[in-house]
Amino acid sequence: MANIKSAIKRAKLSEERRSHNASIKSDMRTAVKTVETLVTNNDLENAKEAFKTASKKLDKAARKGLIHQNAAARQKSRLAKQVNA
């Protein structure tokens, strides 16, 4: 554990950011899984709506630096291919 005051503050801030980033990534993964389950159940109307939400969450995560922009684009492309099939 850190002994210096500034190091203690940095450790606390780092933990807060880690938990915040983890929640955003979790929401993103949940949105992607929702689209995939709706597609497998042939519920294409709801899948298209869920795809819009998932796309927004992927873009936001990429913008925040939680995932790479190309990774977000790749996931969106694969989801779009499933929804439009």
Swiss-Prot record:
Chain's gene name: rpsT
Protein name (database record): Small ribosomal subunit protein bS20
GO molecular function annotation: small ribosomal subunit rRNA binding; structural constituent of ribosome
Family label: Belongs to the bacterial ribosomal protein bS20 family.
General function of this protein: Binds directly to 16S ribosomal RNA.
Region ranges (Disordered): 1-24
Pfam families: Ribosomal_S20p (PF01649)
Family annotation (NCBIfam families): S20
Annotated organism of origin: Bacillus mycoides (strain KBAB4)
Source superkingdom: Bacteria
Keywords: Ribonucleoprotein, Ribosomal protein, RNA-binding, rRNA-binding
GO biological process: translation
InterPro entries referenced in this protein's UniProt entry, alphabetically: Ribosomal_bS20 (IPR002583), Ribosomal_bS20_sf (IPR036510)
One Gene Ontology CC term in the entry: small ribosomal subunit
Classification via SUPFAM superfamilies: Ribosomal protein S20
